[in-house]
Amino acid sequence: MKRTVIAILLVFCLGVTQPALACTTILVGKAASADGSVMVSHSDDGLNDASMIYVPAQDHKPGAMRAVYYSHAALDFKPQWGATISHRIVTRERGPNYDIKDVPPSVPLGYIPQVAHTYAYFDANYGIMNEHQLSIGECTDKAKVHPEPEPGKRIFYSAELSRVALERTKTAREAIRLMGELIEKYGYYGTGETLLVADPHEGWVMEMAGYDMNGAGGVWVAQRVPDDQMFVAANQFRIRDIRANAEDMMYSANIFEIARAKGWWTPESGPLDFARVYGDGEFHHPYYSLRRVWRAQSLAAPSLGLSPWAEGPFTRAYPFAVTPDKKLTVGDIFAIHRDNYEGTEFDLTKGLAAGPFGDPNRFEGNAEGMADKEGKLTPAIGEFERPLNIYRCVYAHVNQSRSWLPDAIGGVVWFGPDRPATAVLMPFYAGATDLPIPIQKADILKFDRQSMWMAFNYVANYSMLKYSYMIKDIHAVRDRFETGAFERQPKLEAEALALWSKGDQAGARERLTRYSDQNARVILTDWWKLASNLYLKYNDGYLNTQKAIADPVFYPAWWLKQVGYEDGPTSYAPKGKRE
């Protein structure tokens, strides 16, 4: 019995660490977008710190050093590096919004020389966008080696790399070169990573990995996304053959040497396939990544007729990037993140697992085992499809970088709290002087009605009780806010541009900051109203309105048949003796 309990606890502990290893990220070139913007999106699909933080621009004294902190997203929370499981960074160095009282401060893994001036940026579990419209997206990948952090040898993970890039650079190429130099000089730890890096003119994919559990340095490669195409990554390396001296590629000087030394590749075998040589396929199970890549590419370019089935994890059936059938908008990109495979053979709103009310959410973990006569657990074998929209997402965003506008106005982060299917996109401008407090308050272990994430997570969780009904109410409110935001965008930006053109840059920034703050606060208030309305309308399983109270909402016939409704107490005779 003791062994059985230990086994169950071990399974549980292993299971709860898995969600950190999952995100989806998309990049759209300027000729593939409807308005000429370069767009980057990211869904952060691990239940952790859900806040988006404003980090102000700062001036630094000569000789100052910049602390490099451990990232929980790399290898899960490690208490020796400070902060808490629900606070990613706690420090005064990055402005007042990371200076959190009564929480253990973050402990540096190491330091690098500071520069004289650092730019303002929006930060979350990875950097998002800086004041110069430099934009970041991310997903975790399964590499052959996931080294632990070690001061003096391996102090950088993608999260801190992205922040340094936003602090110090203005273009995608500058950012990639800087992050590459930091990997090579200070070492890389953690999982493999994909970072999407974009500016108002172009977008690149950068992928990185460690190569030795006790080594220093790391390897990295970057590839430019064609202007007329869309790229997607979903927890698996996507860069394949490295082409020496190609104008659309950059890579670390050691990338060939390390692969040869490890016995992972030889020049005689052909071009170095980064995904195969340094990667280890998909996380968790087959199609954990590939199904999302197929779906995103199919939604953007259905004319390609891509098959959802592949011969293995390193298939070349899905191109590096695709030309969309039509120019894409912010809404189009977020619609991809909201997808649950609706209308396909993998539709998560259908079938017995979706329940009587079409709930697409499938909780992950290890299936409960059956004990044999000796008490040995035999686990149930199987998996659910992994959708683009997932219940454990803490936030998602679509970034716009636009070359024809001043950076302060041209850069927009459309931020959606919690899972995409029930989120509302809210605009925040690169020139903002702060972010709304409800966006920056997101302790997932504290019930707080002033937290934007808490409001959205509350509604999302409650909707699972009667999803096919409640999602319509949720989308009605969502669409009202999003339609309004998109319709107001041209007028708002024209007003800000007029102020900017007159030399009143502070006034333009204040106008954008105030608008975003007011919009967010109205949404927060109305979302809690929505939560109350859903509770009253569907209380006790009924439909309650001004027309009728306790109006029954019964189960569909197909589901009743599946769960044995017909075998219920319809007769006094035993089940086997009924006529």
Question: For the regions a protein language model found, what residue spans apply to each?
Answer:
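A contiguous strand-loop segment
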Residues: 23-157, 178-328
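Substrate-recognition/cap regions that form aromatic- and gly/pro-loop-enriched pockets
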Residues: 362-500
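Positively charged n-region of N-terminal signal peptides that target proteins for export
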Residues: 1-4
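Glycine-rich, aromatic-lined ligand/substrate-binding cores of catalytic
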Residues: 254, 258-412
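Second-shell loop/turn segments in exported
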Residues: 148-152, 160-169
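Histidine-centered catalytic/metal-binding microenvironments
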Residues: 478-579
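Bacterial N-terminal signal peptides
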Residues: 6-17
